[in-house]
Amino acid sequence: MPFLIMLLFVGAIGFQVSFVSRSTTWDMSIAGWVLTGVFILYTAFGLFSNRLPSQMADIIWLYGTATSFSKVVYSVLFFSVTWKALLWIISAIFGDVLIVLLSGDHINLLGRSIIFVGLFFIAEVWLMSVSCARTVKKMKRVYVLVFLLMLGIYSICLYRFFFLQHSSGIWESIARFISGVGLVFDTLSPLYVVVFIGIITVSFMTIAFTSRQVEMKESLVKEAEFWEEFQERQFGSGQIIQKPKTTWWGLQGLNGIWSFLWLELLLFKKYLFFHSIHTVMLSGVFYVVIFMYPEWFYLLFFLIVSAVMLSSYYSGIVRHSQSGTLHLFPGALWKKIIILELTNTVWLYILYCVSITFMAVGNLVYWYIYGLGIYIWFMTIRLFAFTHTNRNDIKLSLPQYYKSFFMALGLSGICLYVIHLLTADWYTLVVVVCIGSLSWCLFYRFR
């Protein structure tokens, strides 16, 4: 945990120094569109994820305590806002000190961070209110309708304002309002003060209303029952011989080495709507980037790959290993690891191939092989981080995992860069990556 806190702290300081320090040169209209988009994303996160206690032990405590449920919600909200605000303010102080030491200038990042803390507060309160609303059916329908309405209006305005380069009537007024949100970093007009106060008021009213509903606690009980059943399946379903079952899509069940994928499919079924929306939105973003802003494609793809890489600790392989299913279910360990990693990451390579095809680049076969080499390198780092950590720490603690992860990433990156300097040929680099990764997998198989 200290390692993760240090990583977040260093990242926050870097963001403050490299990005927030230049806030006076920002295009405030673009900042307004970004802030509005983030607000809509927060609404989606609140609708599709639970920010409230969801473990059975927590639910039992909630039913047995004399404390009102609204106080529990406010406590969770207070903790979420406090640690993020402290991280941001302290990183701003260190950023100011760093800039003064390096350049002698005083930019006052601390003063600017107050604005971000206020935006954090509004976003977190709204996120908690939406998460509370999802536990009550009628409120959930209202918020889903609000989310779809905001997403639709935002998409239409974005298309008309940036792609058609003109808008008229009500769309122009809405686009001007969205662009004006970015002015909070400069001057705060009374209109946006009223809007922000309105969002906070609606959020607290939603929290107060839903926390008094019995349906909210019942929904949390169902959530806790699901995770309790999920854990029981993980710990209690490691039988070598299993009878064929029928899956929820009507085909024969997964047996043998594929049996542990039942748990992944169970989670996929639970969040089917979220995954569908995620796929549609990601496809839409890539369509816009490829055909309208192709120069941004590599940055977008790099950010997605980086997010998947850095979140590898929460992937299926670590989760199954910690629960025991990776070792209890039938099949060779290395086969189960490879199958599980492929099912969790192969979509990245498919997305890369489809995107490259639509971008109409020359010599597609070369770029497919190039992408395959990078994908194998990507897989190798994840496999090394897991196996090295599992060998030294059977509990797979987060700090130990990321130490192995960054060690593999750094050493392999240095080796690849040296090879690139010596050969000056990216094709040679890809071949080396493929052969080296294949050799590593073979050595692990016959170790």
From Swiss-Prot:
Signal peptide: none annotated. The keyword Ribonucleoprotein does not apply. The chain crosses the membrane at residues 4-22, 30-50, 60-80, 86-104, 114-134, 142-160, 190-208, 248-268, 298-318, 342-360, 364-382, 405-423, 427-447. It is a multi-pass membrane protein. Keywords: Antibiotic biosynthesis, Bacteriocin biosynthesis, Cell membrane, Membrane, Transmembrane, Transmembrane helix. Residues 23-29, 81-85, 135-141, 209-247, 319-341, 383-404 are extracellular. Residues 1-3, 51-59, 105-113, 161-189, 269-297, 361-363, 424-426 are cytoplasmic. The keyword Membrane applies. It comes from the Bacteria. It is found in: Cell membrane. Induction: By Spo0A and PhoP, during nutrient starvation, especially phosphate starvation. Repressed by AbrB during normal growth when nutrients are plentiful, in association with the transcriptional repressor Abh. GO terms for cellular component: plasma membrane. InterPro entries: SkfF. Its main location: membrane. Disruption phenotype: When the skfA-skfB-skfC-skfE-skfF-skfG-skfH operon is deleted, increased rate of spore formation; a double operon deletion (sdpA-sdpC plus skfA-skfH) makes spores even faster. GO terms for biological process: bacteriocin biosynthetic process. Accelerated cannibalism by skf- cells is seen on solid media but not in liquid media. Probably part of the ABC transporter SkfEF involved in the export of the bacteriocin SKF. Probably responsible for the translocation of bacteriocin SkfA across the membrane. This is Putative bacteriocin-SkfA transport system permease protein SkfF. It comes from Bacillus subtilis (strain 168). The gene is skfF.
